[in-house]
From Swiss-Prot:
Keywords: Cytoplasm, Elongation factor, GTP-binding, Hydrolase, Magnesium, Metal-binding, Nucleotide-binding, Protein biosynthesis. It comes from Magnetococcus marinus (strain ATCC BAA-1437 / JCM 17883 / MC-1). This is Elongation factor Tu. Belongs to the TRAFAC class translation factor GTPase superfamily. Classic translation factor GTPase family. EF-Tu/EF-1A subfamily. Residues 136-139 are annotated as: G4. It is found in: Cytoplasm.
Length: 396
């Protein structure tokens, strides 16, 4: 039989398993691939294939991540699983593996543990839109009341971090039994129920094309007789010739008109997400625009200087700092295409930050940058990356 061509007919969603160490994230990941493989919708990946994930470097940070893929009736999923807790922290903060939703794995035998809490907080801070809970190892708990107590505890914990704890689907099962092929309510059935819940509850991501136009400006040129051209890769949305666009960040916002879009020396009617283009701007002087600003649909994004961030500070081994830093530390924050100096304030009760820590901090930049929740940045000192972060909340 000929190999089937991979048909992109189903919507694509990125998900991942999160939760405390040894609660069964990797076993569950393997079990999902096994159950889906039985239906001809995945390639089975054994536990040790997933657990021995190779190291990858993302923005200078070493992260181990395993990627598996599978399909349900409705969707195609790319699923990430990380071997170690530090890998999760780095992954979620750098956005190395984008998550449209997560499966929170909690051992019914232990209940929520410190990393359960930390992963929920991280998911909230970095803007993972939805979570589904898999209450694992139910074969180790005989008492039905105890199971209900653990479920209540998980729901309350989710609610305390602003997830809708009462509405989130909680599926009870045993990843190990499913992996062993046991056709029982806690085995294979539980995996099928889990995937139904993921299909139903985790929203389909909005495609970049359908979002408001935004393009980080990488370069500015003057073309004699035609005006100023800014170049960059369109991050999202569409820009059409004749439309108004705003130049945002660093200086005061200016609204102008796009009078031309060029790609590979050809003139186009429009540019769209993913295209590397030159955009011709009406009546804009070359010195009015600079790298680090963005071109965007008017009123779709605002410039800000003050925000809360969730960040990870590199270890010495990763090429980061060798020493801790304190409040009022002034590094550069690299957003999209440029560095902006900022001052950071540590949370109350935190004296200093050591290399390898992850921390919530308040940052004030010396110049405004077009930003919104979820925007990633690097923390740099003299061109060397010392950390990574994500905007958790815009303050001003």
């Amino acid at each position: 039989m000929a190999k089937e061509k991979f048909a992109r007919t189903k919507p694509h969603v990125n998900i991942g398993t999160i939760g405390h160490v040894d609660h069964g994230k990797t076993t569950l990941t393997a079990a999902i691939t096994k159950v889906m493989a039985a239906a001809g919708r995945a390639e089975f990946r054994a536990y040790d294939q997933i657990d021995g994930a190779p190291e990858e470097r993302e923005r200078g940070i070493t992260i181990s991540t395993a990627h598996v893929e599978y399909e349900t009736e409705a969707r195609h999923y790319a699923h990430v699983d990380c071997p170690g807790h530090a890998d999760y922290v780095k992954n979620m903060i750098t956005g190395a593996a984008q998550m449209d939703g997560g499966i929170l794995v909690v051992s019914a035998a232990d209940g929520p543990m410190p990393q359960t809490r930390e992963h929920i907080l991280l998911a909230r801070q970095v803007g993972v839109p939805a979570l589904v809970v898999f209450l694992n190892k139910v074969d180790q708990v005989d008492d039905e009341e105890l199971l209900e107590l653990v479920e209540m505890e998980v729901r309350e914990l989710l609610s305390s971090y602003d997830f809708p704890g009462d509405d989130i689907p909680v599926i009870k099962g045993s990843a190990l039994k499913a992996l062993e092929g046991e056709e029982s309510e806690m085995g294979v059935d539980a995996i099928n129920r889990l995937m139904d819940a993921v299909d139903a509850y985790i929203p389909e991501p909005e495609r970049p094309l359908d979002q408001a136009f935004l393009m980080p400006i990488e370069d500015v040129f003057t073309i004699s007789g035609r005006g100023t051209v800014v170049t960059g890769r369109i991050e999202r949305g569409i820009v059409k010739v004749g439309e108004q666009v705003a130049i945002i960040g660093i200086k005061d916002t200016v609204v102008t008109t796009c009078t031309g879009v060029e790609m590979f020396r050809k003139l186009l009617d429009q540019g769209q997400a993913g295209d590397n283009v030159g955009v011709l701007l009406r009546g804009t002087k070359r010195e009015d625009v600079q790298r680090g600003q963005v071109l965007a649909a008017p009123n779709s994004i605002k410039p800000h200087t003050k925000f809360n961030a969730e960040s990870y500070i590199l270890t010495k081994e990763e090429g980061g700092r060798h020493t801790p830093f304190f409040s009022n530390y002034r590094p550069q924050f690299y957003f999209r295409t440029t560095d902006v100096t900022g001052v950071l304030k540590l949370p109350e009760g935190v004296e200093m930050v050591m290399p390898g820590d992850n921390i919530t901090m308040e940052v004030e930049l010396i110049a405004p940058i077009a930003m919104e929740k979820g925007l990633r940045f690097a923390i740099r000192e003299g061109g060397r990356t010392v950390g990574a972060g994500v905007v958790a909340e815009v303050i001003d």
